[in-house]
C-alpha cells in the first residue's frame, strides 16, 4: 500500500496519464500471497481502497512447490513470518539447496532471491538471529546474500517495534539480486525510536529516527 501511495504522490503524471502504465499499476504491478483467507480478503480490500483496482492477491504456500515464481519481480517488500519451522518435506527443493533448514525466516530469504529479477531489490524484516545465528543454515543464507548478491543496508530496530504482538529484536535487510556478488560498503543504522513508545501501548512519542533513515540512506 505504501509503495502505491508513494507512486501516486510522486509519479502521478508519469503513471496515471499514460494508458499502458496506468493499466500496469491497476492490474499487474502488485502481488501478494498468504495462507490465511481472511488476510487475503483484508489485503485485497486494502489495496482497492488505495486506488489499485485489481490487485493480484492469491492463496498460496509460498515456500512450497505451489509457488513457481522465479526471476519475476523488480521489488519485494516483506515482513515474513519467523520464529516458526516447517516440515522439510513440504518446502520447495530449490530453497533447501540454498539453506537446508526448517526455519521460515531463512527459507523466505532464499525465496526472495529466487523470485527477484536480476537487478531487483528486496527490503525484508528479519529477526536478529538471521544476522548472528551460528548454524550452517544461517551461515549459508548470509553467504548467499553477501557473496552472491549485493547487500546494501542493515537497519537494526529496537525490540519493541512490534509490540504488543512480539518483542523480538529485528532488522531490515536491503539487498539487490545480482547473481555474481557485488557487496562492498554496507550501510548500517541503529534505530533507537520509530515515533511510538516501545511498550505494549505503542503511544505516539516525539523521538523518531525514520525520517533520518530515509534522508541518510
Where are the predicted features?
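A conserved structural/catalytic subdomain of Rossmann-like adenosyl-cofactor enzymes
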Residues: 64-217
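Conserved S-adenosyl-L-methionine
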Residues: 1-78, 83-85, 94, 102, ...
Amino acid at each position: 500500500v505504501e509503495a502505491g501511495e508513494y507512486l501516486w504522490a510522486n509519479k502521478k503524471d508519469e503513471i496515471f496519464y499514460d494508458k499502458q502504465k496506468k493499466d500496469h499499476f491497476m492490474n499487474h504491478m502488485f502481488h501478494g500471497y498468504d495462507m490465511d483467507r481472511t488476510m487475503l480478503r483484508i489485503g485485497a480490500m486494502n489495496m482497492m481502497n488505495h486506488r489499485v483496482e485489481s490487485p493480484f492477491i492469491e492463496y498460496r504456500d509460498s515456500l512450497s512447490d505451489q509457488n513457481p515464481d522465479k526471476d519475476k519481480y523488480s521489488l519485494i517488500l516483506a515482513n515474513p513470518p519467523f520464529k516458526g519451522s516447517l516440515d522439510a518435506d513440504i518446502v520447495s527443493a530449490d530453497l533447501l539447496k540454498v539453506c537446508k533448514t526448517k526455519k521460515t525466516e531463512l527459507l523466505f530469504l532464499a525465496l526472495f532471491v529466487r523470485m527477484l529479477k536480476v537487478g531487483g531489490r528486496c527490503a525484508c524484516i528479519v529477526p536478529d538471529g538471521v544476522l548472528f545465528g551460528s548454524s550452517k543454515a544461517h551461515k549459508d543464507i548470509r553467504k548467499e546474500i553477501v557473496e552472491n548478491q549485493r547487500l546494501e543496508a542493515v537497519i537494526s530496530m529496537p525490540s519493541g517495534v512490534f509490540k504488543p504482538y512480539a518483542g523480538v529484536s529485528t532488522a531490515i535487510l536491503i539487498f539487490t539480486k545480482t547473481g555474481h556478488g557485488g557487496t562492498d560498503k554496507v550501510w548500517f543504522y541503529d534505530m533507537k525510536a520509530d515515533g511510538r513508545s516501545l511498550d505494549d501501548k505503542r503511544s505516539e512519542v516525539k523521538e523518531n529516527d525514520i525520517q533520518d533513515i530515509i534522508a541518510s540512506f
